[in-house]
């Protein structure tokens, strides 16, 4: 895969080069569209094999809303990390969420289509608009603020 512009796509192996998340917390399976400095469209295939369905909820499995938000944040992080030249020395954190709305449940068998647009980027902060769709229907939406920090500084801050 790979490429440039709006047609840029990434498979799971390429995604893992950018995101530090791994199973069971990597919530993006592929990128189907990416326009540098602007937007990304990513896919999460939701299956009954996801560990969270064991307890959320027995007999009526529903993807937890916080994990839908996490998939949005991961897609946003993937887009932002494309633009950082020294990304191996940086970490992205989710700093805040605003206007979060859940519109419909996401269940096993659904394909979550996550669309993220960069609204503003100033210094180490970036504001993004994220939406998640299932079969063309809005499932969730949020405004997210991401914060970029030096990896070494973040690793030393807990001492």
Summary of predicted features, one role per range:
Residues 56-87:
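Helix-adjacent hinge/juxtasegments
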Residues 1-33, 159:
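N-terminal leader/capping segments at the start of a protein or of a new domain
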Residues 23-63, 68:
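Catalytic strand-loop segment that frames the active site of acyl-thioester-processing enzymes
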Residues 2-9, 76-113, 139, 146-147:
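Hydrophobic beta-strand-centered segment that forms part of the acyl-chain substrate-binding groove
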Residues 25-27, 112, 126:
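Hydrophobic core residues within well-ordered beta-strands of beta-rich domains
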Residues 16, 59, 102-104:
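Beta-strand-rich interaction surfaces with strong enrichment in secreted/lumenal proteins
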Residues 7, 20, 36-37, 107-110, ...:
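HotDog/MaoC-like acyl-thioester-processing domains
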Residues 31, 42-44, 97-98, 102, ...:
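A structural signal for short, well-ordered beta-strand segments
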